[in-house]
């Protein structure tokens, strides 16, 4: 990187946490993590979904749906033991634009504007810098496969299509917690991989669903070739209009750097029209990243 401040690097790592959580994989998937509370009506963990497509549909039917959304959250970001805390305001027009205002100690530190085609941000305070590019540029930088839909889904606890054909996904259910999960490998193979009895492929991941609400409660992704691991958990679900949304999100990345993001929403509102103010002052200096 050149002409890059520490704050701009941290902002990119923060976006990396958000993006990497939804990484697409056309390979295999991984195991379950947190324990969800199980309704007393779910007794024997009966597997009533015979196909991944059927279970995926139930998951999609219970996702947060909106035209506009706005939210506020606090974030504790830890990078190799170095902690940073900040607050974020989010505005979104579904499938169109995401706007982020990042502040520290009540002072506007950064603005981010993301569309299907562009990624822009400005750094305020003493930085007075800006970046403008697109997903192909960021994908090349981060060696990832990112897009707008992934970030939008992640911010609101929804799914992002991680496999081209839902009919090829394998459904499963944990006998202890009754959690459902979706994987591209079968349950017995997943157990052998987790126990070390069978080597994993190039990558594998899992989506875990609450057995009552069918909301996503955990994600796991391991990229063997790149030596990267990602895990996410979603808790503290609250009503947002007629939907449920997680108000606490925890992300962990193990790669060249160990990154943890602990996010807690204070509010989420939907279907109130939003504006997306974004301006690059003429005096700001453009940030240049080496490819």
Task: Set out the residue ranges of the language-model regions.
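An acidic-aromatic
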Residues: 97-150
